[in-house]
A protein has these predicted regions:
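A short pre-motif secondary-structure segment
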Residues: 41-45
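C-terminal edge and immediately downstream basic/flexible tail or linker adjoining helix-turn-helix-like DNA-binding
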Residues: 1-6, 57-60, 71-85
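Short, locally clustered residues in the helix-turn-helix/winged-helix DNA-binding domain
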Residues: 31-32, 46, 78
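Amphipathic alpha-helical segment used for protein-protein interaction
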Residues: 2-40, 50, 54-57
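Short intrinsically disordered, low-complexity segments
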Residues: 27, 65, 72-73
C-alpha cells in the first residue's frame, strides 16, 4: 500500500451509511473509467499489493512512471467517488 491508499479509504468510509457492497461496486465502476495503464497499475499495486519494482519489471517501465500513473489513478478514483456519493 502506498501513501495514497488512505485517500480512498477515507473517501469510501466518509459516508456512515455507505455499505461495503455498494462501496466495492462504486470502486469497481471508478476503476473501469481509468485509462488501461492506470487501471493495470492501480490493480497490481492496490489489490495485488505488488511493489513498484515488481510492476516495473512486468510492464517494462520505470518506477517513477508507475508512481505517477498510480497517483493519477487514485486522484481520478477519488474524484469519481466524490461525484457519486
Amino acid at each position: 500500500p502506498g501513501p495514497y491508499d488512505g485517500v480512498l479509504s477515507r473517501t469510501l468510509l466518509a459516508d456512515a451509511y455507505f455499505d461495503g457492497d455498494e462501496a466495492q461496486a462504486l470502486l469497481q465502476e471508478a476503476i473501469a473509467t481509468l485509462p488501461e495503464v492506470q487501471r493495470v497499475v492501480f490493480n497490481l499495486h492496490y489489490f495485488d499489493e505488488m511493489k513498484y519494482r515488481e510492476i516495473s519489471q512486468i510492464l517494462r517501465t520505470s518506477e517513477g512512471a508507475l508512481k505517477a500513473s498510480y497517483h493519477l489513478a487514485v486522484m481520478k478514483i477519488s474524484a469519481y467517488l466524490k461525484r457519486h456519493d
